[in-house]
């Protein structure tokens, strides 16, 4: 994936309300990212986490985020997800788009696109994401980039006896 898109990529798994990054491959010349191996970040703020959450049944998402205290705040922004209604709107947009998108919620000036990896029950067991400087990837390239990520997820899902969404 990194060789094809020439952007850094990572694999994250759900860990409570967080995602845990278990693999990171940095593109040549790309800057170090906060998403290194063994780093945990709030699921609702990351593209990887949003991809996983969007693939979960609504009651499961609600169980993870029962009230405003469940939402961690990282960067003050107008678009900050700080309540369930905002999270639900973002997850619905993710489902409509076909991929999760995070723009500056983790690191200002950087964005990520992610797709879930599903098991044989269609349950999200992980997500693959690519992260890039906003200036490197024009908005009209995001859908194509998401297709590349989806292909990687499909291959991984197949290897663990799942299928892609």
Where are these regions (language model features)?
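Residue-level signature for short turns and capping positions that connect secondary-structure elements
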Residues: 26-27, 48, 135
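Residues embedded in well-ordered beta-strands
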Residues: 10, 20, 51-53, 111, ...
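Short, solvent-exposed recognition segments
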Residues: 30-106
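Intrinsically disordered, low-complexity terminal regulatory regions
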Residues: 1-26, 59, 144-165
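Structural detector of well-ordered beta-strand residues that form the stable sheet scaffold
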Residues: 10-12, 42, 102, 127
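Residue-level recognition of conserved beta-strand positions in structured domain cores
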Residues: 13, 23-24, 35, 45, ...
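Generic beta-structure capping elements
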Residues: 22-25, 55, 67, 127-133
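Extended hydrophobic
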Residues: 77-153
């Amino acid at each position: 994936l990194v060789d094809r898109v020439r952007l850094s990529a990572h694999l994250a798994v759900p860990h409570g309300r967080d995602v845990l990054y278990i693999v990171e491959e940095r593109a040549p010349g790309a800057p170090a990212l906060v998403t290194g191996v063994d780093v945990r970040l709030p699921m609702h703020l990351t593209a990887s986490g949003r991809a996983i959450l969007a693939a979960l049944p609504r009651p499961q998402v609600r169980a993870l985020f029962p009230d405003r205290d469940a939402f961690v705040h990282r960067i003050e922004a107008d678009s900050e997800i700080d309540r369930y209604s905002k999270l639900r709107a973002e997850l619905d947009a993710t489902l409509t788009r076909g991929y999760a998108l995070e723009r500056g919620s983790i690191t200002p000036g950087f964005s990520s696109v992610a797709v879930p990896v599903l098991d044989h029950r269609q349950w999200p067991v992980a997500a693959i994401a690519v992260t890039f400087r906003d200036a490197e990837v024009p908005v009209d390239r995001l859908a194509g980039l998401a297709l590349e990520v989806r292909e990687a997820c499909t291959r991984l899902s197949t290897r663990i006896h799942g299928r892609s969404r």
